[in-house]
Amino acid sequence: MELAILMLTVGSAVVEIKCGSIYRLEEAYTIFLNGEERGTTQKVVTSLFNLSPDRDYLLQLAGEDGSIRGEISFHTKTETAVLNVRDFGEQDDTVFIQAAIMACPPEGRVVIPPGKYRVTSLFLKSNSNLELEEGAVLIYDGRPGRLPILPGLLSGKEENSFALGSWEGEAADMYAALFTGCGAENVNLYGKGEILGGASMEDWWSEENRQSSPHRPRMLFLTHCKHIRVQGLHFSMCPSWCIHPCFCSDLGIYDVEIINPEDSPNTDGINPESCEDVEIAGCHFSLGDDCIAIKSGKGRRAQENPVPG
């Protein structure tokens, strides 16, 4: 059995078990890390969490008969600092989480420990790791009056116009996502935490709000970003598209779960738009629309920025 490492951070890894299956394995395997049992898996793409930074690991998978079927060695990344968001305040979840993100030194790690956090919009910072520990729940406070708006086009010389907000392939004003990345690079967003969009037919999914401008927010929106990795998170009740990278390159999305009601409108799972080098593996979808929709823009935006989609 061949194993491959798809993603590495300071405290996690994603391993692919290459055995001919697509999502679920025919049998369960016991996971051993440096000889210590770490549970079982029956998924082709499996996440490993609670690893130590800058450490050598030997991963071994044992079959039901106890024999080792495959193994691979890897070394976790080095980190410069660990920032617990609870050290940055107690009154406004959005502000103290954002403060921790902005204060994080290059290659540091921001940790969101178990608990419930009500947030509006958080903005990602380059060269950082953001971990949602198991039991951490981010609840999107999506009241329009509290959300930042991303303009469709930033003002400036027409030949140097910069599209920020987006809707259905064209530059358009939109509400900022729970996680927004603008020109961010080298970011890992991972963990076993949950992200609840809180949408319903009474608000974001209503006929009125489906067509209104600014347009509905995503859960993770990335524009002009590079070298981004997303792992292990659980998303649900998204106002519209869940993960929407736009004009991004070198993006990996692994072992995430996206759950929305079957009658929820336009709640696509992952929609890469005008992106390059995108890898999506081991994800689970149960949605009201497309699981994955590859887009390339349209109209003036597609003509001025002819990036393959």
Region annotations inferred by a language model:
Residues 1-309:
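Extracellular/periplasmic carbohydrate-active domains that bind, remodel
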